[in-house]
């Protein structure tokens, strides 16, 4: 490997800012940034020594050896198509869902193309900065650029995994399930606490230790051993009580609860704590329509 490349960023949102700051701290030369929002570019440049705000994406590409496209996914291809790329330069996007195929214009001009997706959540810039070191990074690139990206991941203290283009959508769907939909589940859970008089922030605070404990159990015990609760132990009576309470007080939450409980049955069976008979009873219970005719509640159709 030769000297570290001069890096530039097109896009100065949470991902770009966190990645630029972490790479700068790791000894990389971050020389330029351009963004549709000039204030965001100025904020990024102010936190990375030696980084200049440039007026256009083309100016960044002209100055840098390796350009990170850290725009929203739906803007990547448009940005790349609008740049005249130098042969031998490199362009990398940070989308988790899209492959390097969207960089075909740059590749046709002789640029190396790749993707580097941090498997991490970026709710705000400072939290992203704290979360990024040590994360998993999905890498897709051809050989020379691949080696550069693997070195970048190593320098960030991360763990690299390599994906084929056709694997990206499933990989990203898994990330969405774990990260984004956990937030949705917390919203649904706190909705129930609102029903018995709590404010949402207090409910979140009360439930967070349980969430952290679950994550700790998954880390320590793995799957399916980390599963606990009424489905895991075949507690049909408790599930019946839950369903009745939800049908009465929170019918909007009931379909999600039932579907998740059904999806939990094979996990509990694999753990060995749920008998086949109890699994059958729960499956029948969870498939039952709990809404009276004409109530307008959601009904299972499968």
Please describe what each predicted stretch is.
Residues 26-27, 63, 109, 156:
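Conserved dinucleotide-binding and phosphotransfer motif residues
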Residues 38, 48, 52-127:
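Rossmann-like NAD(P)(H) cofactor-binding subdomain of soluble oxidoreductases
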Residues 28-29, 111, 158, 198:
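Short phosphate-binding/catalytic loops that engage adenosine nucleotides
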Residues 216-274:
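Interdomain hinge/lid region at the active-site interface
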Residues 43-47, 128-220:
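Internal alpha-helical scaffold of NAD(P)-dependent oxidoreductase catalytic cores
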């Amino acid at each position: 490997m030769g000297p570290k490349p001069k890096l530039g960023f097109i896009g100065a949102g949470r991902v770009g800012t966190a990645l630029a700051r972490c790479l700068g701290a790791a000894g990389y030369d971050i020389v330029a940034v351009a963004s549709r929002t000039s204030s965001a570019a100025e904020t990024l440049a102010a936190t990375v020594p030696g980084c200049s705000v440039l007026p256009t994406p083309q100016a960044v590409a002209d100055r840098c050896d390796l350009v990170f496209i850290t725009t929203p996914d739906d803007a990547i291809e448009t940005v790349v198509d609008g740049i005249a790329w130098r042969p031998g330069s490199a362009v990398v996007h940070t989308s988790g869902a899209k492959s390097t195929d969207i960089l075909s214009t740059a590749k046709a001009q002789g640029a190396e193309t790749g993707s580097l997706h941090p498997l991490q959540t970026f709710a705000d810039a400072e939290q992203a900065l704290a979360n990024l070191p040590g994360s998993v990074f999905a890498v897709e690139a051809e050989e020379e650029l691949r080696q550069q990206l693997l070195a970048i991941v190593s320098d960030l203290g991360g763990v690299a995994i390599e994906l084929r283009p056709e694997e990206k959508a499933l990989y990203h769907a898994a990330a969405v399930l774990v990260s984004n939909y956990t937030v949705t589940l917390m919203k649904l859970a706190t909705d129930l606490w609102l029903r018995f008089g709590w404010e949402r922030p207090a409910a979140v605070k009360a439930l967070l230790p349980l969430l952290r404990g679950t994550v700790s159990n998954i880390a320590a015990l793995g799957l399916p051993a980390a599963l606990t609760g009424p489905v895991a132990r075949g507690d049909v009576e408790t599930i019946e009580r839950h369903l009745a309470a939800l049908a009465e007080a929170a019918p909007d939450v009931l379909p999600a609860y039932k579907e998740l409980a059904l999806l939990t049955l094979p996990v509990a069976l694999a753990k060995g704590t749920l008998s086949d008979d109890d699994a059958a009873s729960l499956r029948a219970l969870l498939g039952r329509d709990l809404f009276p005719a004409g109530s307008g509640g959601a009904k299972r159709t499968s």
